[in-house]
From Swiss-Prot:
Transmembrane helix recorded as keyword: yes
Domain of life from the UniProt record: Eukaryota
Keyword Transmembrane attached: yes
Lineage, uppermost ranks: Eukaryota, Metazoa, Chordata, Craniata, Vertebrata
Subcellular location: Membrane
Protein name (record): Transmembrane protein 105
One cellular component (GO) term of this entry: membrane
Transmembrane segments: 23-43, 94-114
């Protein structure tokens, strides 16, 4: 009587959260956060980037928007607050929560509506002609 000895494979068993789907989510997240931070930094007036300055009277300078806080800072604070709410902050909940704050071109790329496979997949050169 022969018993087959099954050797343990070198690769661990694939779990559903590993693989291309998860990696795509992370890359999409990073692109989204990078573009959003660049976008908000571009909106900021230069005085805020240089640091808080006080006027000769001692009161802080007024922002061009009046008494209210700066919109892009508020948006970033909202996004950061949402990001720490749940364990799956990088998944659809985070993106759906922050999408109404961003321009449509950024949100389309963040949602993955622009599919990379269709643009740069195998055979795209032949199909594109």
């Amino acid at each position: 009587m022969l018993l087959k000895v099954r050797r343990a494979s070198l690769k661990p068993p694939a779990t559903p959260h590993q693989g291309a789907f998860r990696a795509g989510n992370v890359i999409g997240q990073l692109i989204y956060l990078l573009t959003w931070s660049l976008f908000t930094a571009w909106l900021r007036p230069p005085t805020l980037l240089q640091g808080p300055r006080t006027s000769p009277q001692g009161s802080p300078p007024r922002s061009p928007w009046g008494d209210c806080a700066e919109p892009s800072c508020l948006c970033e604070m909202k996004i950061r607050r949402r990001r720490h709410e749940g364990p799956a902050w990088g998944q659809s909940g985070f993106l759906a929560g922050g999408l109404h704050l961003v321009p449509s071109s950024l949100s389309l790329a963040a949602c993955g509506v622009v599919r990379m496979k269709g643009l740069w997949g195998r055979g795209a050169g032949i199909r594109g002609r």
